[in-house]
Swiss-Prot record:
Protein name: Trypsin inhibitor 1
SMART domains: PTI (SM00286)
Keywords: Disulfide bond, Knottin, Protease inhibitor, Secreted, Serine protease inhibitor
GO molecular function: serine-type endopeptidase inhibitor activity
Family affiliation: Belongs to the protease inhibitor I7 (squash-type serine protease inhibitor) family.
Annotated InterPro entries: Prot_inh_squash (IPR000737), Proteinase_amylase_inhib_sf (IPR011052)
Transmembrane segments: none
Function: Inhibits trypsin.
Subcellular location: Secreted
Site entry: Reactive bond: 6-7
Length: 30
C-alpha cells in the first residue's frame, strides 16, 4: 500500500503527485 494523500490532483507524470502517489491513466494522482 502506497502512502498517498487522498486528494484529487491532476498530473502528467508521477513527480507531479505528492507522497508516493503515481500518475494514473485517467490523468489524476492515485
Amino acid at each position: 500500500e502506497r502512502r498517498c494523500p487522498r486528494i484529487l490532483k491532476q498530473c502528467k507524470r508521477d513527480s507531479d503527485c505528492p507522497g508516493e502517489c503515481i500518475c494514473m491513466a485517467h490523468g489524476f494522482c492515485g
